[in-house]
Design a protein with these regions (language model features):
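Low-complexity, Pro/Ser/Thr- and charge-rich linker/hinge segments at domain boundaries
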Residues: 664-684
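A general structural signal for short secondary-structure boundary/capping elements
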Residues: 381-385, 513-518, 614, 666-668, ...
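Extended hydrophobic/Leu-rich segments
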Residues: 524, 560, 694, 698, ...
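N-terminal hydrophobic targeting/anchoring segments and the immediately downstream early-domain regions
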Residues: 1-75, 80-90, 94-96, 102, ...
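Terminal connector regions
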Residues: 624-671
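Glycoside hydrolase catalytic-domain context in secreted enzymes
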Residues: 1-625, 644-647, 652, 811, ...
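Polar-face residues of amphipathic alpha-helices and helix-prone low-complexity segments
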Residues: 826-961
Length: 961
């Protein structure tokens, strides 16, 4: 049966259901017509399949091989390695019954502070596109689909679900869409995932220009577009704009909205049919349910975790970058070597959030080093917090004096970078910097191995002899680090991002993470090395930088240009005495350009392996896009006629060969800005663009950056937004406790900061039916000071009472100081007391009711009101200081220290002895009749309480009368 024929047999309700998930990971099915579901799963550097379909959490996932995260994979600059990795992941997916893996993530690294940079490839769109394409080809070669993400301009975690990226079209096309375009055209991914954020005021999930005009009409994408989890705001608008599938399930909420929109004439059913067709085509590709295409017979997938771990180790070696080496590496196993830092024994191998993998095995660098030699160890500092421990530091420095060489394992703790929030600074923990400085003061041979997902500042860089950037290297990172330290393998990775000296040096320093409503991309095209070269800024380590244990020479450049294309040939020789791999990079620059441009841009690269003394000729082809820029006025890519320079080098700052060529073509530009109109982009600093200049570039006025203080809270606002209202400031804590405490979304967002920035509509949609629309409406009404008493009663009827439920506590607090008129009336009235002293069956119930009556009276008094207000202020302060997180961390650390010291076993043994002693004591008490005496005393106390309660009741009644 043809898919369009099937669509004709579907009811409107079935169509609406098919364009939404069935649960967290599966598409919907229609048994009546034999339409099955397919399964998707998180990635992208390992399979993260949940064992529980209802869970969005990191726990309870299948064991899988954890490869280096995106930052490290990009440092390989190796298309073949990415393709191989994709193939491995594809086989693992097939073995586990997964049809689509959610990756790769190719968002551009606009700022080193983005909390999710560890998952992204590069600051350069060409490199990201090339590596992403190889990854996609590898996965899909195994009969498994990918979901290319996050489309588009999702370059920060702060307010990622609501912020609008204000960005000019040329920058959007050249920097932020370019990698997606390359992958769509060259690798043809089965699906693409839209991002949470808005672009110039429109949610990506509702952006018809982005999803239809650009993606499908211009690029020729014929796959399925799915939402990021919870990224849907207005489902009918999304259907019309080209969003085919909403994930995860909204438990029928979105489906009903789509049905209503079609019936009301607000959504043409043809758009729904298009979305359904895209869903069914994808399902058919992986199930063959129509019997029209069938599914090619596949060999049973082999999930060989041992073999895959070995590949993870090989890829991790290539993913690490030797930033500095003054002859101390590789290590000699005869040396007296000291490892310092907890990461040596407990490596940080991956980032936090939806990409977190349940690893098959982890071998630390300390364990792996035992295969080479005996290594001494000093903890030096904690790897999981920034707390200086003088005793640990003193021990490490003393041991460093006695060693021949010291290797310090440092980097960023988990809490410093994760999905859901951005970093606040580029600093490493001060406890680590202090120990590094202390050791370099007494030990001339010091190596630093870094475990981090994004650039860090290194105030000690000049004082150490070697720096190895290990990134987040996956489960085999410890072995890979040791392989490189001891020369078993030769470092070959190179940076896919610039390491600036300081945060203030970065191009978007003044515009990251932006304002409440918007983030302005005022730096335009000048991201990463494009900016640093534009302004002539010194950097710590340049884009493309990476050292080897050998040296390479470049020679004999020859460029053959043909119309708007060119072929670049040159030779590379291994001039050292060990085998190694070099990454040759080709950059293009335009001389005397009439449009503003970067000094040069990466347009080609090749990784080549050479034996000692071996020489190879490299050939790299440059297509028309290598010489083009995007013209918003012309609505297309244009090539400027004139002279260009081809640069060949070992990094963006280490250019070895140059050749000038001329391209003869027609100048097709319709309208270009002059240097007078955009001085910062032509001759000044793009980091200091005025509002007026940015508006000229945009062609329109800048949108509002914040809401007015008196604007009401809506379902599209966040908990953080609610704080701007009169009552929201006071109720933020209780409302936060209500929603986060009920865990309506599982653990998909792993931190409180991220949760507070999720809009109410996403919380509702992702609750999988555990929150109802009218429940959320009631909360919003409370925040807006509307129908307070009615909403509290309504929420109470939903079972959200004071007994053990956060919302009940919220309602109780609201009643004490909300609607002052009602409170005053109740105080004046003094009525309703008798309802608490009705017929009671026993003295205990009477006492309980009277106690609640007293509390009610207190709540109506100024005393309780002030106490509640003070309590809320204290609660807010605790929230601001993240006291609970710190307390949790302290408890965890105490537990870990107890475990390390063997206290658990000692306590268990002591507990056993106490238990034995307790039994003996109880036996003695029984023999002496003590238990009976205690029981009798208890009865007497109970009788006394009954009498007291009765007397208390009489006093209350008398006072009321």
């Amino acid at each position: 049966m043809e898919i369009r024929e099937i669509i004709g047999q579907l009811t409107l309700e079935e169509k609406a259901a098919l364009v939404g998930g069935a649960d967290a990971w599966n598409t919907a099915k229609v048994d009546r017509l034999g339409i099955p579901s397919i399964r998707v799963s998180d990635g992208p550097h390992g399979l993260r399949k949940t064992l529980d379909d209802a869970s969005l959490g990191i726990e309870d996932t299948v064991k899988a091989v954890c490869f280096p995260s995106g930052a490290g994979l990009a440092a390989t600059w190796n298309r073949d390695a990415l393709k191989k990795l994709g193939g491995i992941l594809g086989r693992e997916c097939r073995a586990e019954g997964v049809d689509i893996i959610l990756g790769p993530a190719v968002n551009i690294k606009r700022s080193p502070l983005c909390g999710r940079n560890f998952e992204y490839f590069s600051e350069d769109p060409y490199l990201a596109g090339q590596l992403g394409s190889a990854y996609v080809q590898g996965v899909q070669s195994e009969g498994v689909g990918v979901s290319l993400k996050h489309f588009a301009a999702n370059n920060q975690e702060k307010r990622r679900m609501t912020v609008s990226a204000v960005i000019d079209e040329r920058t959007l096309r050249e920097i932020y869409l370019s990698a997606f375009e390359e992958i769509v055209k060259s690798a043809k991914p089965d699906t693409l995932m839209c991002s949470y954020n808005k672009i110039n005021g429109t949610y990506s999930s509702e952006n018809g220009w982005l999803l239809n005009e650009v993606l499908r009409n211009e690029w020729g994408f014929d796959g399925l577009v799915m939402s990021d989890w919870g990224a849907v705001c207005d489902r009918p608008k999304g259907v019309e704009a080209g969003l085919d599938l909403e994930m995860p399930t909204s438990s029928g909420l979105s489906a009903q909205k789509v049905v209503d929109a079609v019936i009301d004439g607000k959504l043409d059913e043809k758009y729904l049919d298009i979305a359904v067709e895209h869903v069914l085509k994808l399902v058919d590709k992986y199930t063959g349910f129509t019997n029209a295409t069938g599914v090619a017979e596949k060999e049973p997938a082999v999930f060989d975790r041992v073999a895959d771990h070995k590949d993870a180790r090989r890829i991790a070696r290539e993913a690490m970058v030797l930033l500095k080496n003054e002859g101390v590496l590789p290590l000699n196993k005869e040396q007296k070597i000291l490892f310092v830092g907890e990461f040596a024994k407990k490596p940080r191998i991956q980032g936090g959030g939806s990409s977190h993998i349940n690893c098959t095995r982890i071998i630390s660098a300390y364990e792996a080093s035992a295969r080479h030699t005996k290594v001494d160890y000093a903890k030096g500092f904690s790897a999981f917090e920034d707390k200086i421990d003088d005793e640990l530091a003193k021990e490490a420095i003393q041991k460093a004096k006695e060693a021949d060489v010291v290797v310090i394992f440092a980097g960023l703790p988990d809490v410093f970078e994760s999905e859901g929030y951005d970093r606040k600074h580029m600093r490493m923990p001060q406890c680590q910097n202090r120990v590094i400085r202390g050791i370099t003061a007494v030990q001339p041979n010091t190596v630093v191995v870094l475990h981090n997902g994004s650039p860090v500042s290194m105030p000690w860089a000049d004082d150490v002899n070697a720096i190895l950037e290990a990134y987040l290297g996956g489960e085999a990172s410890g072995e890979a680090v040791v392989d490189l330290l001891f020369g078993v393998a030769n470092p070959s990775g190179k940076l896919a991002e610039t390491f600036p000296n300081t945060l203030k040096d970065t191009p978007c320093y003044n515009n990251f993470p932006g304002n409440r409503l918007t983030v302005e991309y005022r730096e335009g095209l000048f991201v990463g090395y494009r900016y640093y070269e534009k302004v002539g800024a010194e950097v710590l380590f340049p884009f493309g930088h990476g050292l080897s244990y050998t040296t390479f020479t470049y020679d004999s450049i020859k460029v053959i240009s043909d119309n708007k294309k060119a072929k670049v040939k040159f030779k590379i020789k291994n001039a050292g005495n060990v085998a190694g791999s070099e990454i040759a990079q080709v950059y293009v620059s335009k001389l005397d350009s009439k449009v503003y441009r970067a000094v040069k841009e990466l347009k080609g690269f090749e990784k080549v392996s050479l034996k000692p003394g071996e020489e190879k000729e490299i050939e790299i082809e440059l297509d028309e896009r290598a010489f083009s820029y995007y013209s918003p006025a012309a609505g297309k890519w244009l090539t400027e006629p004139g002279k260009y320079v081809i640069h060949v080098g070992a990094s963006s700052a280490d250019i070895r060969l140059r050749e000038e060529i001329t391209i003869d073509c027609e100048d097709q530009e319709v309208k270009r800005f002059s240097p007078e109109e955009l001085p910062s982009y032509y001759t000044g600093s793009p980091a200091c663009v005025s509002s007026e200049e940015f508006e000229r570039l945009l062609g329109e006025e800048l949108p509002a950056t914040d809401k007015e203080p008196d604007e009401p809270v809506t379902i599209h606002d966040t908990l953080e937004d609610a704080k701007r209202t009169k009552w929201g400031k006071r109720l933020y804590g209780p409302v936060y406790s209500l929603i986060s405490g009920r865990k309506v979304m599982g653990n998909h967002v792993d931190n409180d900061w991220g949760f507070s920035e999720i809009p109410f509509h996403s919380i509702l949609n992702m609750s999988q039916g555990r929150l109802k629309p009218d429940t959320v409406d009631a909360v919003i009404n409370l925040l807006n000071d509307i129908d307070v008493a009615d909403n509290i009663r309504f929420l109470g009827n939903r079972g959200m009472t004071v007994t053990g439920n956060a919302l009940g506590a919220l309602g109780e607090k609201i009643l004490t100081y909300k609607n002052e008129r009602q409170v005053k009336e109740m105080n004046d009235n003094n009525s309703g007391m008798d309802k608490f002293v009705n017929t009671l069956e026993n003295a205990g119930e009477k006492l309980g009711e009277i106690g609640r009556d007293v509390i009610d009276r207190l709540e109506k008094s100024d005393l309780m009101k002030k106490a509640n207000e003070a309590g809320l202020k204290i609660g807010e302060k605790i929230d601001e200081l993240h006291f609970s997180e710190k307390l949790d961390g302290a408890v965890s650390r105490a537990a870990q220290k107890a475990e390390d010291a063997g206290l658990k076993d000692k306590i268990d043994a002591l507990g056993g002895k106490l238990g034995d002693a307790g039994e003996s004591i109880m036996k003695k008490l029984e023999e002496n009749g003590v238990q009976e005496k205690l029981k009798e005393a208890g009865n007497q106390i109970e009788e006394g309480l009954k009498k007291a309660a009765s007397g208390f009741e009489e006093k209350i009644k008398g006072k009321n009368e």
